[in-house]
């Protein structure tokens, strides 16, 4: 979803499929550090599956963390250079979903193959997955708009031109991942949804 004030600012709130799949797969095999969860953002699915005896769990966790970080850096770079056509990255456009051969972290491939259809079933549920997160796109965008109007009233001028890209993931990020002035990752829960003071501090830097 996009909210904008013509010739001034733009806020793009997206439920990115790829980021949410990476988190889903990480939860499914217990590859995400416990520090990424709290009472507002719990690990789900909770039915953790066993990994192959040929793989080391610590190595898989490192690979998962690096993969997640790689995708965030890629998205942040594209936001910086205005490549907004890739707001929502679909898994099947990045990878061959039958093999995930494009994934550099080879040991993760079999877990991606196994978890992808399970993820997509949940992701496309009428009352869950993507639809639940898209509801928060609307809520977050509306409240952010209100914050910008409040700041404009205080400083008695219109906002400077800026673009803010917000990715929404369903869990795994207990605090905001503030990559840059123009790119952040949040969950529907926790202190950012909706922490007005945090948003006011963030937006004052942009407005």
Task: Briefly describe each language-model feature range.
Residues 25, 30-36, 40, 76-80, ...:
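Generic alpha-helix signal with a bias toward terminal, lower-confidence helices
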Residues 1-125:
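N-terminal low-structure segments adjacent to metalloprotease catalytic domains
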Residues 119-184:
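Auxiliary, metal-adjacent structural segments of Zn-dependent hydrolase domains
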Residues 186-187, 191-207:
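Active-site recognition of the HExxH zinc-binding catalytic motif
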Residues 52, 56, 135-143, 190-191:
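Conserved aromatic-histidine-acidic binding/catalytic patches
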Residues 62, 106, 142-145, 149, ...:
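Generic alpha-helical secondary structure signal
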């Amino acid at each position: 979803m996009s909210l904008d004030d013509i010739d001034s600012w733009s806020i793009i709130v997206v439920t990115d499929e790829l980021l949410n799949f990476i988190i889903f797969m990480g939860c499914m095999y217990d590859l995400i550090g416990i520090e990424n969860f709290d009472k507002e953002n719990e690990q789900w699915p909770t039915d953790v599956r066993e990994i192959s005896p040929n793989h080391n769990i610590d190595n898989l966790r490192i690979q998962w963390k690096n993969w997640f970080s790689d995708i965030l850096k890629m998205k942040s770079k594209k936001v910086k250079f205005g490549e907004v056509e890739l707001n929502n990255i679909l898994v099947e456009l990045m990878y061959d979903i039958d093999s995930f051969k494009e994934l550099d972290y080879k040991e993760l491939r079999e877990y991606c193959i196994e978890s992808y259809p399970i993820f997509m079933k949940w992701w496309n549920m009428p009352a869950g997955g993507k639809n639940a997160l898209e509801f928060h796109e609307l809520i977050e965008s509306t409240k952010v708009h209100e914050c910008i109007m409040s700041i404009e009233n205080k400083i008695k001028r219109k906002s400077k031109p800026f673009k803010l890209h917000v990715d929404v993931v369903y869990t795994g990020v207990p605090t905001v991942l503030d990559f840059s002035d123009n790119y952040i990752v949040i969950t529907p829960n926790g202190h950012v949804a909706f922490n007005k003071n945090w948003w006011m501090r963030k937006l004052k830097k942009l407005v």
